[in-house]
Amino acid sequence: MTLAILGISCLAAVLSHTILFIRGEWDKHAPVLFHCFITCPIALICSLLAVGLYGITFMFIQVWLCYISSICLSIIIYRLFLHPLRDFPGKVSARLSTLRWMKTAAVDRKWHLEVQNMHSVYGDFVRIRPREISVNNFNAIRDLAKCARGPFYDVNYPHKSLQMTRDRNFHLRRKKIWQKAFSPNAMLAHEGHVRQCCQELMGYLSSRGGQPVEVTELMQRVTFESMGWLVFGKAFNMIQKGLSHPGFTQLRSVKQLGGLLLWAPWTLILLRNLPFLRSKATSWLQWCSQEVVERKQNPTMTHDLFSHLLDDESKDTDDLVYDSELAVVAGSDSTASTLTAILFLLATHPDKQAILQKEVDDMNIGGLPMPTSTLVNMPYLNSCINEALRLYPAVMSGSQRETGPGGVILDGQFIPEHMLVSMPTYTIHRDKRNFVRPDEFIPERWTSQSHLTLNPDAFIPFSVGVYGCLGKPFAMMEMRMVISSIMSRFNLRLLPGRPMSHEASAPAYDCYIIHIPAFSLVFEPRAGNIWA
């Protein structure tokens, strides 16, 4: 009798896998599956033990473990020998489960380096997860950009934002609204707020009197302040006054969960839906929600992002919360990391710093901060920014896409239908087939030494296609203004004893959005320079 029951359990496991679980997507249903396979069985076992039904309890445990082990065995056999991606190269453990990458992605946050290493071993097309192929081939960029988004973008399920949605119609409708916030006229209004942030930054750096300054947090404060104006139309007073802010604290805390997003996006869906695990995952969203409610209750004449989002007749409060999260995270965190990288690269390359300072001095006729109309015509400044974006793109692991019915051909390689494909930006940007001396900081590759850029189309820091970054104009304006302001007034110096190597002294962590650990620089006032 016992063997018969266990046999039925095994059969049920195999049938549920082959008929149900290999069809469709289950990531967004992670909480339901967790309760069905973990919470409920454990609760039942505890209940049976409480009433003294030990025999039934033992039998249930056997059946439960038999089902779990059988479905795991079925999954292993399918993924190794029957899966549509079985012929693609890659590590055997990666074909079986994403558990292979838990430490690399979620703990060490070095997923970008692991992917780069796999491509160096296995080639342009590598199976990095049971259902996902990583493609390091610039010829495939445009074709891949046409594909739909993958389940990675269900992480906010059941809610949506401009970025975290797979609903193309929702995205297109939301995109039109966001575009208004980054139109040329809107950018002129935003420029004044960024200028004010730069002035506060210059005042703060001057007050330090040449003492070491922790750069990573300072740049995060600057960009968070500018996002306060852009998104909510108000100041957070975090630069000159050095005030702390709950939203800023929550953002820094929640960023540590970015590794989970890269390892297995469904883990964040699970965290947000399990009462005993949700506190850290939701505290950041609670702050965003409070800001949204406050902004809705206090209409202003400011043409911030929310002035456009609130005009949307189909607006949903929860979706507004996730749009605000997107704006603050994408607008402040990613830009702050790029600014941090630029400053360190300039500090470790004094010759490049001197060239940039000369360009700034030559163009700085009307005082600081210079207007955008001047900054966009400064080739070396823009080259330094582009080179930092190449070496340290904001999203190093790239974007996930899903092949449609019939599959897709990428540079001659067929990818079966309904498979996931990602294009690792960090790896592409550091591929010697695309850029000569790819690991070196050479701003001239974008100007006088263009021969060092073999494939300009391989430069994709803001992504491409319909899902490209809408905030690029604002990010570029802010980076140009901050860097030019600093270069006009200060020399950047490393602390004594600091190695002259960016990668060795300030390694980049892949938290979905790049993170550069804390380090300090000396902002030494330039002799004879008067800041207007």
From Swiss-Prot:
Against InterPro entries, the record matches this protein to: Cyt_P450, Cyt_P450_E_grp-IV, Cyt_P450_sf, Cytochrome_P450_monoxygenase
Q: What does this protein do?
A: Cytochrome P450 monooxygenase; part of the gene cluster that mediates the biosynthesis of the indole diterpenes nodulisporic acids (NA). Nodulisporic acid A (NAA) and its chemically modified derivatives are of particular significance because of their highly potent insecticidal activity against blood-feeding arthropods and lack of observable adverse effects on mammals, in particular the tremogenicity associated with the paspaline-derived IDTs is not observed.
Known EC number = 1.-.-.-
Q: What GO MF terms are annotated?
A: heme binding; iron ion binding; monooxygenase activity; oxidoreductase activity, acting on paired donors, with incorporation or reduction of molecular oxygen
Q: Where does heme bind?
A: C469
Q: Where in the cell is it found?
A: Membrane
User: Which Gene3D superfamilies does the entry mention?
Assistant: Cytochrome P450 (1.10.630.10)
Name used for this protein in its record: Cytochrome P450 monooxygenase nodW
Q: Which cofactor does it need?
A: heme
A GO cellular component annotation here is: membrane
Q: In which pathway does it act?
A: Secondary metabolite biosynthesis
Transmembrane spans? 2-21, 31-53, 60-82
Tell me the name of the encoding gene: nodW
Q: Which UniProt keywords apply?
A: Heme, Iron, Membrane, Metal-binding, Monooxygenase, Oxidoreductase, Transmembrane, Transmembrane helix
Family according to the record? Belongs to the cytochrome P450 family.
Broad EC category: oxidoreductase
Q: How does it sit in the membrane?
A: Multi-pass membrane protein
